[in-house]
UniProtKB/Swiss-Prot annotation:
Lipidation (S-palmitoyl cysteine): 561-562, 565
Biological process annotations from GO: G protein-coupled receptor signaling pathway; regulation of G protein-coupled receptor signaling pathway; regulation of signal transduction; Wnt signaling pathway
GO cellular component terms listed in the entry, alphabetical order: cytoplasm; membrane; plasma membrane
Family from the record: Belongs to the protein kinase superfamily. AGC Ser/Thr protein kinase family. GPRK subfamily.
Gene from which this protein is expressed: GRK6
Name the record gives this protein: G protein-coupled receptor kinase 6
Location(s), subcellular: Membrane
Length: 576
């Protein structure tokens, strides 16, 4: 049986490496799968798409790139884009070099004698910026100028963009994005672990070669446990959050037996594995601080959307190929309505805050408590309120959480102890992160003094540990316990309403990022070299008629469209 595990791991590693060919894991038919429709097929989409500058030109990756291509055709707009890029670079520039970077920005884009003066900038605002720059180059120095530049771009230039071939090309990409997603969109690989309602396995998009984790929720298991609301809640929260520190939902689809969430694949294992199974338990302080800072950013992104996580623990923090973390498993996360509090005694014993244990009302305070527990565990090599592999009754753990201060060893520096103790304050009103400043309070703690959070948020800081690319950081295939068959439950037509709410296909921002990262956008986004309109973007032209199929083709052909095309036999991976 060891052979079975070796084969499964070998096939997965080969897929992660791009299959060893020039296509980097893409199907032989990838261009056919991502073939643009004729623009006339996008008319309904054109009429229904909301004309929002922020969404179309800033948030959506392909929309952002196409708007920039449009701006590159007009010098005054090209200067605006260059200024915005310069500001973004200024904000992540190290402190000791930021003033010089700011001076260069001012000279190029804000001075009348500069080569790239941007339009419609109040001179008084420029004067104020210049003075503030010399006094001290704060990161938000150009914030108002950035807002005014976007305001300028969002009026006449945006209107012109909507009438351009670049926006028409965006409609074609949106048409592809909205095509049905089925199990044939993916290749399936080995099981990685178990979720609450089914297995988690590795998978690969046939059209792009992008690897993901597929979390399968068995329909009968959901129905037996009455888990419909919980499953839909997790899906909708994942769909809403766009953060480099939280796993992304890229697709949601259904098969005959399961609902499937296609999520960011994290190849580096979870923090529980790294804390306890990679030598001495715990991390050096610098490594623990780095992970705590990234988790803080993830919590900040969740809380910005008014989502409280409620299940922060080592096994829910995953490492990617480069050693950065993402928060995973949002099954217990919930939206907190503006101006309201919630109640719910949920979470994991030893990580639940005192107010949760007491069943009191709260907003986001349990997450900051759990961050304190996790930081403590990363440094100490054990949880603050229970020792590993030592059985303590739940009631005793909860008594310790509510009443007994945690103990600190010599492994904690004074600053690390200070941050942990402020996060583990029993009174949520006095806890760091809950005094009115949220994540900002935590980020300003002296333990993070050497960290540039702007650079961290942009993924520009080198992690202290990089996972081995040839390692599989999960249990052997046969060591992952299989689910038993669900008996006594039958699926009914009325269940279909829930399935339709769940299986909504591609999620726009992750899907567009996938197209860009896998270079599909770069290879397919081609316009006429002489400035002419390509046939597929000509509103006056007619879409080409599909080639006629012979009788045998009509009888035996399978439906081929947008990622649902099946590969030839030789391309299919070994399935175990």
């Amino acid at each position: 049986m060891e052979l079975e595990n070796i084969v499964a791991n070998t096939v997965l590693l080969k897929a992660r490496e791009g299959g060893g060919g020039n296509r980097k894991g893409k199907s032989k038919k990838w261009r056919q799968m991502l073939q643009f429709p004729h623009i006339s097929q996008c008319e309904e989409l054109r009429l229904s798409l909301e004309r929002d500058y922020h969404s179309l030109c800033e948030r959506q990756p392909i929309g952002r790139l196409l708007f920039r291509e449009f701006c590159a055709t007009r010098p005054e707009l090209s200067r605006c884009v260059a200024f915005l890029d310069g500001v973004a670079e200024y904000e992540v520039t190290p402190d000791d070099k930021r003033k010089a970077c700011g001076r260069q920005l001012t000279q190029n884009f804000l001075s009348h004698t500069g080569p790239d003066l941007i339009p419609e900038v109040p001179r008084q605002l420029v004067t104020n910026c210049t003075q503030r720059l010399e006094q001290g180059p704060c990161k938000d120095l150009f914030q108002e100028l950035t807002r005014l530049t976007h305001e300028y771009l969002s009026v006449a230039p945006f209107a012109d963009y909507l009438d351009s071939i670049y926006f028409n090309r965006f409609l074609q990409w949106k048409w592809l994005e909205r095509q049905p997603v089925t199990k044939n969109t993916f290749r399936q690989y080995r099981v990685l672990g178990k979720g609450g309602f089914g297995e988690v396995c590795a998978c690969q998009v046939r059209a792009t070669g992008k690897m993901y984790a597929c979390k399968k929720l068995e329909k009968k298991r959901i129905k037996k446990r009455k888990g419909e609301a919980m499953a839909l809640n997790e899906k909708q929260i994942l769909e809403k959050v766009n953060s480099r520190f939280v796993v992304s939902l890229a697709y949601a689809y259904e098969t005959k037996d399961a609902l499937c969430l296609v999520l960011t694949l994290m190849n580096g294992g979870d923090l529980k594995f790294h804390i306890y199974h990679m030598g001495q338990a715990g991390f050096p302080e610098a490594r623990a601080v780095f992970y705590a800072a990234e988790i803080c950013c993830g919590l900040e992104d969740l809380h910005r959307e008014r989502i409280v996580y409620r299940d922060l623990k080592p096994e829910n923090i995953l490492l990617d190929d480069h050693g950065h973390i993402r928060i995973s498993d949002l099954g217990l996360a919930v939206h907190v309505p503006e101006g309201q509090t919630i109640k719910g005694r949920v979470g994991t014993v030893g990580y639940m805050a005192p107010e949760v244990v007491k069943n009191e009302r709260y907003t986001f305070s349990p997450d900051w408590w759990a961050l304190g527990c996790l930081l403590y565990e990363m440094i100490a090599g054990q949880s603050p309120f229970q020792q590993r592999k030592k059985k303590i009754k739940r009631e005793e753990v909860e008594r310790l959480v509510k009443e007994v201060p945690e103990e600190y060893s010599e492994r904690f520096s004074p600053q690390a102890r200070s941050l942990c103790s402020q996060l583990l304050c029993k009174d949520p009103a006095e806890r760091l992160g809950c005094r009115g400043g949220s994540a900002r309070e935590v980020k300003e703690h002296p333990l993070f003094k050497k960290l540039n959070f702007k650079r961290l948020g942009a993924g520009m800081l080198e992690p202290p540990f990089k996972p081995d690319p040839q390692a599989i950081y999960c249990k052997d295939v046969l060591d992952i316990e299989q689910f038993s068959t669900v008996k006594g439950v039958e699926l009914e037509p009325t269940d279909q309403d829930f399935y339709q709410k769940f299986a909504t296909g591609s999620v726009p921002i992750p899907w567009q990022n996938e197209m860009v990262e896998t270079e599909c956008f770069q290879e397919l986004n081609v316009f006429g070299l002489d400035g002419s309109v390509p046939p597929d973007l000509d509103w006056k032209g007619q879409p080409p008629a599909p080639p006629k199929k012979g009788l045998l083709q009509r009888l035996f052909s399978r439906q081929d469209c947008c990622g649902n095309c099946s590969d030839s036999e030789e391309e299919l991976p070994t399935r175990l």
